[in-house]
A protein has these predicted regions:
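Glycine-rich phosphate-binding active-site loops on the catalytic face of alpha/beta enzymes
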Residues: 73-87, 167-169, 231-241, 286, ...
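Active-site beta->alpha loop and helix N-cap motifs at the rims of alpha/beta catalytic domains
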Residues: 95, 101-164, 169
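Glycine/Thr-rich beta-alpha phosphate-binding loop at enzyme active sites
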Residues: 23, 27-28, 32-35, 170-183, ...
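Short beta-strand/loop segments at the ligand-binding rim of alpha/beta enzyme cores
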Residues: 47-54, 128-136, 196-212, 273-283
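Active-site glycine- and acidic-residue-rich loops that bind
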Residues: 138-150, 177, 183, 206-226
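Active-site-adjacent beta->alpha loops and helix N-cap segments on the catalytic face
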Residues: 85-94, 115-117, 123-125, 171-202, ...
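Alpha/beta catalytic cores of nucleotide-metabolism and tRNA/nucleoside-modifying enzymes
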Residues: 1-34, 92-96, 101-116, 120, ...
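Catalytic cores of alpha/beta
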Residues: 62-69, 150-151, 212-226, 273-277, ...
Length: 344
């Protein structure tokens, strides 16, 4: 109710400024405790999630408010993408609301304060309850991007519930080429070696693009199984452009929100088939309701994430979705989220 009154005011502001105000409100707000485990609790990649709904990477790029996000009702929060060195990202404006389409286009370019600052911030919350994943990336001008990912894995592994390797942002030139089979094997070998193999190290998830050919999907699935990845996050934003009504439709960057829904769902089903259920999947892209989250779970997602829908629906969306998921799980006769995964 409160957000419905605030939204017209926020939408008069530049999208990036409004995002900054939202971060500030969470940082200085009263805060709430992380959600306790309940009927939606699920175990994925050795991690106990109080519910399967997460905040996707991109909202909290520097790990400033993970606990505040958990307090909104999310079962987990993914911070980042974080790169070894600070970088400003692409020139502004670089974030656009496509209101008529329920969508967002961004070309942020991995803007963040760098690994050292984020690590200090995240180290200060160690011991707090809640699942916090850390999404890692490479600097735009790096001479050795694989070394960037490896150094970030080593730095963040002690601080993360899981690591998410982002090779699918369309806003860093050449980054998506790391999804090619040979490059991806070398990258993951570097990340896994840097993370270590002793008990208690966080699982590694890989975030992939929706704009993949069938051969790419099969290769990534084989690699994920071979490298024993904790999960595949399906998917990042798309560079494709379905028909859009907004005046910002022609902006360069990654498209997210409602127009991504069908593509992301199709890609999730592709990865479910390609992996045979051997690797947990995280469904993300165009989810804005409990029904859509449930659809993604039934299609094979062990976990789901949202972000763009929060822009339009506000901070109450997480609790609305989890409440709806409980009702849908009961309606369809499932005893747990895990039982429903891939049941379509």
């Amino acid at each position: 109710m409160v957000y419905s009154l605030l939204r017209p005011l926020l939408f008069r502001l530049d999208a990036e400024r409004a995002h900054g105000l939202a971060l500030s409100a969470l940082k200085h707000g009263p805060g709430c405790r992380a959600s306790p485990a309940g009927p939606l609790a699920t175990r994925v990649a050795g991690i106990n999630f109080p519910n399967p709904l997460g905040m996707a990477a991109g909202f909290d790029k520097d790990g400033e408010v993970p606990d505040a996000l958990l307090g909104l009702g999310f079962g987990f929060a993914e911070v980042g993408s974080i790169t070894p060195l600070p970088q400003a990202g692409n020139p502004r404006p670089r974030l656009f609301r496509l209101v008529e389409d329920g969508a967002v286009i961004n070309r942020m370019g991995f803007n963040n304060g760098g690994g050292a600052a984020a690590a200090r911030r995240l180290a200060a919350r160690l011991g707090q309850p809640g699942v916090v994943g850390i999404n890692i990336g490479a600097n735009k001008d790096s001479a050795d991007r694989i070394a960037d990912y490896a150094s970030m894995a080593a730095l963040m592994a002690p601080l993360a519930s899981y690591l998410a390797v982002n090779v699918s942002s369309p806003n860093t030139p050449g980054l998506r080429a790391l999804q090619d089979e040979g490059a991806l094997v070398a990258l993951l070998d570097g990340v896994l070696a840097a993370r270590g193999s002793v008990a208690g190290v966080p699982p590694v998830f890989l975030k992939v693009a929706p704009d993949l050919e069938p051969g790419d999907i099969d290769a990534i699935a084989r690699i994920a199984i071979d490298k024993k990845l904790g999960g595949l996050i399906v998917s990042n934003t798309t560079i494709s452009r379905p028909p859009l009504a907004s005046r910002h439709a022609g902006e360069a960057g990654g498209l997210s929100g409602a127009p991504l829904h069908d593509l992301a769902l199709a890609r999730l089903r592709d990865f479910r088939k390609a992996t045979g259920g051997a690797v947990p999947l995280v469904g993300v892209g165009g989810i804005a309701s409990a029904g859509q989250a449930w659809e993604r779970i039934r299609a094979g997602a062990s976990l789901v994430q949202i972000y763009s829908a929060m822009v339009y629906e506000g901070p109450g969306l997480a609790r609305a979705i989890t409440k709806g998921l409980e009702a849908l799980m009961r309606r369809d006769g499932f005893a747990s989220i895990a039982e429903a995964v891939g049941s379509e």
